[in-house]
Amino acid sequence: MATRFRQTRRRRGHVSMGYGRIGKHRKQRGGRGNAGGQHHRKTWFTTFHPDYFGKHGMRVFHLKANKYYCPSINVDSLWSLVGKDVQEQYKNAKTGEEVPVIDCVKHGYFKVLGKGFLPKQPVIVRARYFSEKAQQKIKAVGGACELTA
């Protein structure tokens, strides 16, 4: 809408001419933007943005999880995963009958090693890896080795 007078004519009599009373139409004496956050605007920053400054820890983006993580268990410790009552329950089981299943991965072990001896009792062992001796000893008592992912 066209007006008859310019703004300067219309604002005569108003002290600040529309530019406010604090800066009075001068440049940024407090700095631009977030300047002075630790100096003359410290109270404002500590009140409304308390964690703006300082260290906040880090994300270790270059560190990979251990790809060689492979906890192992020996053949002589396999029965300790299931307990004595299970061993007694399947004591007289033959190769064709129902035999206990020992899931090593469920108990936190990925690899079965061949140290020690197994009781002469068939058993199915599930793991991600088996050493050759462990496979031989498990099969010698009539058991089986199952690879899991």
Curated annotation (Swiss-Prot):
Highest taxon in the source lineage: Eukaryota
A GO BP entry: translation
GO molecular function: structural constituent of ribosome
Keywords: Cytoplasm, Endoplasmic reticulum, Ribonucleoprotein, Ribosomal protein
One family name in Pfam for this protein: Ribosomal_L27A
Localization annotation: Cytoplasm, Cytosol; Cytoplasm; Endoplasmic reticulum
SUPFAM superfamilies: Ribosomal proteins L15p and L18e (SSF52080)
Region (Disordered): 21-40
Broad class of the protein's primary localization: cytoplasm
PROSITE patterns reported for this sequence: RIBOSOMAL_L15 (PS00475)
Assembly mode: Component of the large ribosomal subunit.
The family this protein is said to belong to: Belongs to the universal ribosomal protein uL15 family.
Protein name: Large ribosomal subunit protein uL15C
Protein's gene: rpl27a-3
